[in-house]
Amino acid sequence: MELVDEVEEDDILMNLIDKEVHQWICPGKVWLDTEGKRIQAHGGSIFYEKDLFYWYGENKEKTAPGNGIIQWGVRYYSSRDLYHWKDEGLLIPPDVENEKSLLHPSSKVERPHIVYNKLTRKYVCWMKVICDKEQLAIILVADQFTGPYMIVKSGFKPL
C-alpha cells in the first residue's frame, strides 16, 4: 500500500512540474526553454563558443500529421550552464517560396552539423536532406555562428 501511495505522490509532482519550467533535468519528460516552451532542436548538436553553448537542430514546431510540413528550418538556443536554454529563433529559416529548394518545409532536413573552419574563418553547416525520396546534401556558410547562412552547394549525393 505504501508503494502505491508513493507512486501517486510522484505522479502528482510530475504533473505539476510539466506545467512549469523544470528546475532540474527530468529524464523522459519534455525539455522546456526559458520561456516554458518545448525545445525544438531535433537531431541536434551543441556548439561552444565565447562562454556560450548553442543547441541547434531540426525545428518541428509546425509539423503535424498530414500537413506536409516536415521541418520549419533549423532552430537554435543558447545557454551558459547547459540547463537553461534561451530560444534564439531560426538559425536557418525554411525557404517557403521555392518548392524545389532543399530548405522547403516539405523536404526532410536531417541532423544539421556546424563546424568552424579556421582557414576560411567561416562557419560551415552541412545537412542531409531527403527530397522526392532521394538523399541529397546541402552546404551553407556564415561569417558568425548565428548566421545568416548562405547556400554554397546543394543537391549533390552524400557519401
What positions do the PLM features span?
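Carbohydrate-active catalytic/glycan-binding domains of CAZyme proteins
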Residues: 1-159
